[in-house]
Amino acid sequence: MSKIVLNKGETVHIPTSNLLATLSWTASVDLDIYAFYRAKRNIKPRRGLFGIGGVEPGQEGKIYFIDNGSLKRFPWIHLDRDAGVGDVGGQNKETIHIASLDELEHVLIAINIFDKPHTNFASYDGKVTLKVGEDLIEVPLVATDNCRWCVVAHI
């Protein structure tokens, strides 16, 4: 197993299936991981059972603490939990699992500092670890800009 640490602006190639993105932190803050996605424009539309799991070409959406997604149907992305709710410190972790990118044009992995205006990521101890096969790619959240959003990966 190898580990790569990415700094702001650096890039690395990521394969197209079975990817884990884990946000971890211990500070007393509610951080949230998101996966924003867009379906490929050339896929065949299909209806889901009871309106769940269907897909349209170019369809956009997000997986986050309100919509945890699914590994069993489109978009093949799932969030395991919402940690740190109420600014609870400790061994907080949230993991997004992407089972397949076959029907997706792209996915953005982003982090949000929930309900804290006028703050930045350097104030906390967050990091995102991408597990791709046996490799780990670590992205420390150290931006000092006054911003509550950070895009970690464009897949």
Label the model's feature ranges.
Residues 1-106, 110-155:
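Intrinsic-disorder/low-complexity signal
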